[in-house]
Amino acid sequence: MDDNVKPLSDIPAINRFLSYCRIRTVPSKTVVIHAGDLPDVLYYIISGSVEVMIEDEEGNEMVLAYLNKGQFFGEMGLFYEQPTRTAWVRTRGQCELAEMTYPRFRQIAAESPGLIFELATQLADSESSASDRTDVECRRAHR
């Protein structure tokens, strides 16, 4: 990596992952993932924030989570057989996102299993942190 270029993350494994990704800037309020889409792309938030939403039976939007810089989304299809996406993901403001197709991810996993292990550790830490935040929020809501 060029010494004059600032890394996108403080985590070396993430920077290596990002070197394989397509990076794009996405405007505010843009739907990145639609429920019903094929699950075929993994995303990483370089900057900005997104909201993960579903629709209830009456068609009302329900926000499941807010994800921020340094978090992945769209990963469920990598680990579970899902024919389609089950939620929408929309940017809350302008975001810089890294994208990698599942086939490309699997190719890199075969070529660099160490990198994938490091990323899996980051993903597990991120999911654990999100779960802890959700647990705290649920407790506050039910006081």
Regions picked out by a protein language model, each given a short descriptive name:
Residues 1-31, 77-78, 111:
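Cyclic nucleotide-binding regulatory module and flanking cytosolic helices
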Residues 29, 40-53, 69-70:
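Glycine- and acidic-residue-biased ligand/ion/polar-headgroup-sensing regions
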Residues 32-37:
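Short phosphate-coordinating micro-motif centered on Lys-Gly-acidic
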Residues 18, 22, 121-124, 128:
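Amphipathic, well-packed alpha-helical segments that form the structural scaffold of globular domains
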Residues 130-142:
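Short, Lys/Arg-enriched, Trp-marked, Pro/Gly-tolerant hinge/linker segments that flank
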Residues 50-62:
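A short beta-strand-loop-beta hairpin characteristic of the jelly-roll/cupin
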Residues 65-121, 128:
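Cyclic-nucleotide recognition modules
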Residues 21, 39-40:
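Short loop/turn microsegments at loop-to-beta-strand junctions
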